[in-house]
Protein backbone atom coordinates (compact mmCIF):
# COMPACT_ATOMS: atom_id res chain seq x y z
CA UNK A 1 0.00 0.00 0.00
CA UNK A 2 1.34 3.41 -1.00
CA UNK A 3 4.70 2.40 -2.49
CA UNK A 4 5.89 3.46 -5.93
CA UNK A 5 9.25 3.45 -7.67
CA UNK A 6 10.56 5.68 -10.44
CA UNK A 7 13.83 5.12 -12.32
CA UNK A 8 15.22 7.66 -14.73
CA UNK A 9 18.47 8.27 -16.56
CA UNK A 10 19.47 11.92 -16.31
CA UNK A 11 21.95 13.54 -18.72
CA UNK A 12 23.93 15.15 -15.90
CA UNK A 13 26.58 13.91 -13.45
CA UNK A 14 25.50 12.50 -10.06
CA UNK A 15 26.64 15.51 -8.03
CA UNK A 16 24.56 17.86 -10.20
CA UNK A 17 21.47 15.63 -9.90
CA UNK A 18 22.06 15.35 -6.15
CA UNK A 19 22.24 19.13 -5.78
CA UNK A 20 18.86 19.52 -7.47
CA UNK A 21 16.97 16.69 -5.75
CA UNK A 22 18.26 17.68 -2.30
CA UNK A 23 17.44 21.37 -2.70
CA UNK A 24 14.72 20.93 -0.07
CA UNK A 25 13.79 24.62 0.05
CA UNK A 26 13.34 24.46 -3.73
CA UNK A 27 10.98 21.49 -3.78
CA UNK A 28 8.08 23.93 -3.92
CA UNK A 29 9.15 24.69 -7.51
CA UNK A 30 8.22 21.16 -8.51
CA UNK A 31 5.55 19.95 -6.08
CA UNK A 32 2.22 21.60 -6.93
CA UNK A 33 0.66 23.96 -4.36
CA UNK A 34 3.55 23.42 -1.93
CA UNK A 35 5.82 25.66 0.10
CA UNK A 36 8.77 24.30 2.05
CA UNK A 37 10.06 24.79 5.58
CA UNK A 38 13.50 23.47 6.53
CA UNK A 39 15.60 23.10 9.67
CA UNK A 40 18.57 25.48 9.74
CA UNK A 41 22.01 24.25 8.76
CA UNK A 42 23.18 21.59 6.35
CA UNK A 43 21.24 18.41 5.68
CA UNK A 44 22.34 15.54 7.95
CA UNK A 45 20.87 12.53 9.74
CA UNK A 46 18.15 13.83 12.07
CA UNK A 47 17.57 17.00 10.03
CA UNK A 48 13.91 17.75 9.22
CA UNK A 49 11.92 19.60 6.61
CA UNK A 50 8.28 19.82 5.63
CA UNK A 51 6.18 20.54 2.60
CA UNK A 52 3.06 22.55 3.32
CA UNK A 53 0.56 21.68 0.58
CA UNK A 54 -2.86 23.08 -0.14
CA UNK A 55 -4.87 26.16 -1.03
CA UNK A 56 -5.94 28.89 1.37
CA UNK A 57 -6.87 27.51 4.78
CA UNK A 58 -7.06 23.92 3.54
CA UNK A 59 -3.43 22.83 3.94
CA UNK A 60 -1.50 19.94 5.45
CA UNK A 61 2.15 19.45 6.32
CA UNK A 62 4.24 16.51 5.11
CA UNK A 63 6.93 16.44 7.82
CA UNK A 64 10.06 14.43 6.98
CA UNK A 65 13.25 13.50 8.85
CA UNK A 66 16.52 12.35 7.25
CA UNK A 67 17.57 8.89 8.52
CA UNK A 68 20.42 8.12 6.08
CA UNK A 69 22.58 10.68 4.29
CA UNK A 70 25.45 9.79 1.94
CA UNK A 71 26.12 12.46 -0.73
CA UNK A 72 28.07 11.41 -3.83
CA UNK A 73 31.77 12.16 -3.84
CA UNK A 74 33.89 12.68 -6.96
CA UNK A 75 31.21 11.52 -9.38
CA UNK A 76 30.30 8.45 -7.32
CA UNK A 77 27.00 7.17 -5.99
CA UNK A 78 24.92 8.86 -3.32
CA UNK A 79 21.78 8.04 -1.37
CA UNK A 80 19.42 9.34 1.25
CA UNK A 81 16.51 7.95 3.19
CA UNK A 82 13.82 9.84 5.02
CA UNK A 83 10.78 8.98 7.08
CA UNK A 84 7.48 10.84 7.13
CA UNK A 85 6.65 11.79 10.71
CA UNK A 86 3.77 14.21 10.31
CA UNK A 87 0.22 14.08 11.57
CA UNK A 88 -1.40 13.36 8.19
CA UNK A 89 1.16 11.31 6.25
CA UNK A 90 3.25 8.26 7.14
CA UNK A 91 5.85 6.51 5.01
CA UNK A 92 9.40 6.86 3.76
CA UNK A 93 11.52 7.64 0.70
CA UNK A 94 14.77 6.05 -0.49
CA UNK A 95 16.61 7.89 -3.25
CA UNK A 96 19.88 6.97 -4.97
CA UNK A 97 22.01 8.55 -7.67
CA UNK A 98 24.32 6.20 -9.57
CA UNK A 99 26.91 7.23 -12.18
CA UNK A 100 26.52 5.85 -15.70
CA UNK A 101 28.25 6.65 -19.02
CA UNK A 102 31.61 7.37 -17.36
CA UNK A 103 29.90 9.63 -14.82
CA UNK A 104 28.44 11.93 -17.45
CA UNK A 105 24.93 10.63 -16.73
CA UNK A 106 23.07 9.52 -13.63
CA UNK A 107 20.65 6.73 -12.92
CA UNK A 108 18.14 8.22 -10.47
CA UNK A 109 16.24 5.67 -8.37
CA UNK A 110 13.36 7.03 -6.30
CA UNK A 111 11.24 4.72 -4.10
CA UNK A 112 8.63 6.20 -1.84
CA UNK A 113 5.86 5.01 0.42
CA UNK A 114 3.09 7.48 1.25
CA UNK A 115 0.16 6.51 3.48
CA UNK A 116 -2.59 8.83 4.67
CA UNK A 117 -3.13 8.84 8.44
CA UNK A 118 -4.99 7.51 10.30
CA UNK A 119 -3.94 4.21 8.76
CA UNK A 120 -7.51 2.81 8.35
CA UNK A 121 -8.34 5.90 6.26
CA UNK A 122 -5.10 5.40 4.34
CA UNK A 123 -6.11 1.84 3.48
CA UNK A 124 -9.47 3.05 2.20
CA UNK A 125 -7.97 5.88 0.13
CA UNK A 126 -4.89 3.90 -0.95
CA UNK A 127 -6.00 2.86 -4.45
CA UNK A 128 -6.73 6.49 -5.37
CA UNK A 129 -3.79 8.13 -3.60
CA UNK A 130 -1.34 5.55 -4.99
CA UNK A 131 -2.30 6.44 -8.57
CA UNK A 132 -2.22 10.18 -7.90
CA UNK A 133 1.18 9.97 -6.17
CA UNK A 134 2.71 7.95 -9.01
CA UNK A 135 1.55 10.51 -11.59
CA UNK A 136 2.53 13.57 -9.54
CA UNK A 137 5.96 12.21 -8.62
CA UNK A 138 6.71 11.11 -12.18
CA UNK A 139 6.16 14.74 -13.19
CA UNK A 140 8.11 16.14 -10.23
CA UNK A 141 11.09 13.88 -10.96
CA UNK A 142 10.96 14.72 -14.68
CA UNK A 143 11.09 18.42 -13.81
CA UNK A 144 13.98 17.86 -11.39
CA UNK A 145 15.85 15.91 -14.08
CA UNK A 146 15.29 18.70 -16.59
CA UNK A 147 16.66 21.27 -14.15
CA UNK A 148 19.74 19.14 -13.44
CA UNK A 149 20.32 18.65 -17.16
CA UNK A 150 19.96 22.37 -17.80
CA UNK A 151 22.44 23.18 -15.04
CA UNK A 152 24.86 20.67 -16.55
CA UNK A 153 24.43 22.22 -20.00
CA UNK A 154 23.12 18.95 -21.42
CA UNK A 155 20.19 18.40 -23.77
CA UNK A 156 17.04 17.21 -22.00
CA UNK A 157 16.41 13.47 -21.84
CA UNK A 158 12.68 14.11 -22.37
CA UNK A 159 9.74 13.28 -20.16
Feature roles, as predicted:
Residues 58-69, 81-84:
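Helix-adjacent hinge/juxtasegments
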Residues 83-139, 146, 155:
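Beta-strand/loop substructures that line and gate deep hydrophobic ligand-binding cavities in soluble
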Residues 17-21, 27, 49, 66, ...:
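Hydrophobic pocket/interface hotspot
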Residues 48-55, 79-86:
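Short beta-strand segments that buttress and anchor functional surface loops
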Residues 1-44, 159:
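Hydrophobic ligand-binding cavity/cleft-lining segments
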